[in-house]
């Protein structure tokens, strides 16, 4: 679980669970062998914007530069195909169903999960993903928490966003230890558009706060 940073939330947590016995960060858990060591790759996205884009709302910017950005989506698709050349279990996290469908249609041997799926559908999709070689699972924010798939070898954050908690919770999906992997590879994108560039910088700060290895 992601421990809250604000004092009141931490006190509420302590009141329910008891006093802190030992404070261990992600780096410590990695060093002690409880989490898989990650390598984070920040992939720059070419600036295709115009002056007029500064007048767009955040929702409009997100749709243009993330959901429907053909150049960016092609980068994600080609990245997945390249990884699939070797044994792998790839998790791609997106924000909305439309983005999930775009990637699902273009990436071979991919599976898709969304919030409206009932429990039986989720379980079957996850099992199919686990049992298939060189497979890709594309999920909306449902994949951020509550899903335990330790076999994940590669995580692609295709959704952007700036929230530290959301970023670290997504990261946690891939750090589970499993006999099939010695390392896990994380891919994130440095978008150059209004709102999105600032959000990318915030995510990098979140990774750096854990002392993780980052390639920019």
Where are these regions (language model features)?
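Conserved helicase ATPase core of P-loop NTP-dependent helicases/translocases
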Residues: 89-93, 98-102, 108-147, 166
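A short beta-strand element within the Helicase C-terminal
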Residues: 138-139, 144-161, 166-169, 183-189
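Post-DEXD/H (motif II) to motif III coupling segment of the RecA-like Helicase ATP-binding lobe
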Residues: 1-41, 207
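Conserved interdomain hinge at the start of the Helicase C-terminal
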Residues: 50-106
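Conserved SF2 helicase motif VI
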Residues: 2-3, 162-186, 203-204
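Switch/connector loops and helix/strand junctions flanking conserved nucleotide-binding motifs
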Residues: 4-10, 24, 50-52, 146-149, ...
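Conserved P-loop NTPase
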Residues: 32, 36-56, 206-213
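C-terminal helicase lobe
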Residues: 178-216
């Amino acid at each position: 679980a992601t421990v809250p940073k604000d004092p009141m939330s931490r006190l509420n947590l302590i009141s329910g669970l008891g006093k802190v016995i030992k404070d261990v960060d992600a780096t410590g858990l990695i060093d002690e062998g409880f989490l898989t060591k990650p390598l984070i790759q920040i992939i720059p996205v070419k600036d295709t914007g115009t002056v007029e884009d500064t007048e767009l709302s955040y929702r409009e910017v997100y749709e243009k530069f993330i959901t429907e950005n053909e150049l960016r989506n092609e980068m994600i698709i080609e990245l997945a195909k390249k990884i699939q050349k070797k044994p792998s279990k790839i998790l791609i996290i997106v924000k909305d169903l439309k983005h999930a469908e775009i990637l699902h249609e273009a990436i071979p041997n991919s599976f898709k999960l969304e919030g409206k799926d009932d429990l039986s559908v989720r379980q079957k999709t996850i099992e199919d993903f686990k049992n298939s070689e060189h497979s890709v699972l594309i999920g909306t924010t449902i994949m951020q928490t509550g899903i335990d798939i330790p076999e994940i070898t590669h995580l692609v954050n295709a959704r952007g966003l700036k929230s530290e908690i959301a970023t670290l919770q997504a990261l946690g999906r891939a750090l589970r230890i499993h006999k099939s992997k010695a390392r896990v590879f994380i891919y994130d994108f440095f978008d150059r558009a209004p709102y999105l560039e600032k959000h990318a910088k915030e995510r990098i700060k979140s990774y750096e706060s854990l002392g993780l290895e980052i390639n920019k």
